[in-house]
Amino acid sequence: MARGRSRKRSRSSSRSPSGSGREKGGARSSAASPGPRHRLSSAAAREGRKKEGRKKKKRKAKASSSDRSSSSRSSSSSSSTSSSDSDTRAKQHSRRKRGKHKDKKKKKKMKKKLKKKSKERVKEERGVSEALPGPSLELWQKEPLADSGPVLTDEQKSRIQAMKPMTKEEWDARQSVIRRVVDPETGRTRLIKGDGEVLEEIVSKERHKEINKQATRGDGLAFQVRTGMLK
């Protein structure tokens, strides 16, 4: 009987590890094959990750769009400022031109007014001179010839004519005349062009000697007359 019990115990003990192995295998199988709850949680996590990725993409798109809008605004503002600067410059240039044109017009008007005033003054002076009573023809005819004044000589007439303005042609003709003038005191003869330009005459040696002799004689006589040596 004791042997039979020991065999049963050995069998039970031999069987017990197999049962424990079965339990372990069941635990392993349960751990290897997840349940429906675990599957649902993993799917929810995946969906959450996808949503977060979409949100990140949307944020990035918004940031890029905001950057683009800000850059476009800055470019538009810079273009508007540049256009406004160009407009102000053009306006200033046009104002300057208008101011210059107005100044020119004012100067022209002032010149015209001055010319008119000068013409009016000349007319008034002429009118006053014409209005003054002058000697009539009858008075001139009745006056004696002795009171008419001294008779003008040729030199005085020439001086009066010289005081009158001459044209360029008359001046050139007068200055082109060459004449030989003799000094009455010394007896020297000179070639004078125009009003007093002395010209040199080219002569031979013999003629030059004769001219010098005559000049020295004339100079000596003139000196004696001035000093009173000759009477």
UniProtKB/Swiss-Prot annotation:
Pfam families: SR-25. It is found in: Nucleus, Nucleolus; Nucleus speckle. Keywords: mRNA processing, mRNA splicing, Nucleus. Residues 1-12, 51-62, 91-120 have a biased composition (Basic residues). One of its GO terms (cellular component) is nucleolus. One of its GO terms (biological process) is RNA splicing. May be involved in modulating alternative pre-mRNA splicing. This is ADP-ribosylation factor-like protein 6-interacting protein 4. It comes from Gallus gallus.
